[in-house]
Design a protein with these regions (language model features):
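Acidic/histidine-rich catalytic neighborhood of metal-dependent amide-processing enzymes
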Residues: 1, 25-121, 142-145
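Acidic/His- and Gly-rich active-site-bordering loop/insert found
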Residues: 1-27
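Sec/Tat-exported extracytoplasmic proteins
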Residues: 6, 19, 25, 50-57, ...
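Short, glycine-/Ser/Thr-/acidic-enriched flexible segments
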Residues: 9, 22, 69, 101, ...
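Loop/turn elements at helix/coil->beta-strand transitions in domains of secreted/extracellular proteins
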Residues: 11-15, 58-62, 89-93, 130, ...
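Generic beta-strand/beta-sheet core signal
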Residues: 18, 65-67, 97, 157-160
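Active-site-adjacent substrate-binding region
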Residues: 104-203
């Protein structure tokens, strides 16, 4: 796992941004799976969020975690959930980003039980700003790195863009930067920023 922290003005709570940087890698001597959509895209979003908060000092500490082992049964996130740098009880919200480089106008998401209390804020922001045609909320599943935290009562949301033109390259050797679609990159970034600002203004 690779972890960065941007210190906020307060240290009693924090936000956490996660994405896995591993992929399938090599298969034999000649076959290589690049993993641009899955999940260089999500990793790029959390790096952009980190750059934003370096320039704009946040109210609370921010943790940016690039997990390894997601494609090996969530090993990296499971380990971190058992050995967190800050108590899990201090997490105001965790955002997990996986496969963002597609062009489906509806954004797939999963929300933990504890995250549902503030989920209407995501819907309100999206309705006002029109970032996505809709937020397509699905049942919580153990398919990405938010899951170990959801099981430990952390408020979290998982964003993934699937079903567009890039999805046909999922887990293939053609998941390359040439097939990377950036149209939902900024809307995802902006929705998260607006959510944090909206949560702060309501405190």
């Amino acid at each position: 796992n690779v972890i960065a922290k941007v210190e906020g003005r307060r240290h009693d709570s924090c936000y956490v941004f996660t994405a896995h940087y591993d992929h399938l890698g090599k298969l034999g001597k000649k076959t290589f799976y690049p993993g641009a959509h899955d999940n260089a895209s999500g990793t790029a979003v959390i790096m952009t969020l980190a750059a934003h908060y370096v320039k704009n000092k946040p109210e609370y500490d921010m943790y940016f975690i690039a997990f390894s082992g997601e494609d090996a049964n969530l090993r990296g996130s499971e380990w971190y959930a058992e050995h967190p740098l800050a108590p899990l009880s201090q997490i105001k919200y965790l955002f997990n980003l996986d496969m963002i480089a597609d062009n489906n106008p509806a954004q797939y998401c999963e929300v933990s039980n504890e995250g549902m209390r503030l989920y209407p804020l995501f819907e309100k922001i999206n309705a006002e700003k029109g970032y996505f045609k809709e937020l397509d909320r699905n049942e919580l599943d153990g398919n990405s790195d938010h899951y170990p935290f959801a099981l430990r009562n952390v408020p979290c949301i998982f964003f993934m863009n699937e079903g567009g033109d890039a999805f046909k390259y999922y887990h293939t050797i053609y998941d390359t930067w040439e097939n990377f679609i950036i149209s939902n990159y900024e809307p995802t970034f902006s929705l998260i920023i607006d959510f944090i600002n909206g949560q702060r203004s309501s405190e």
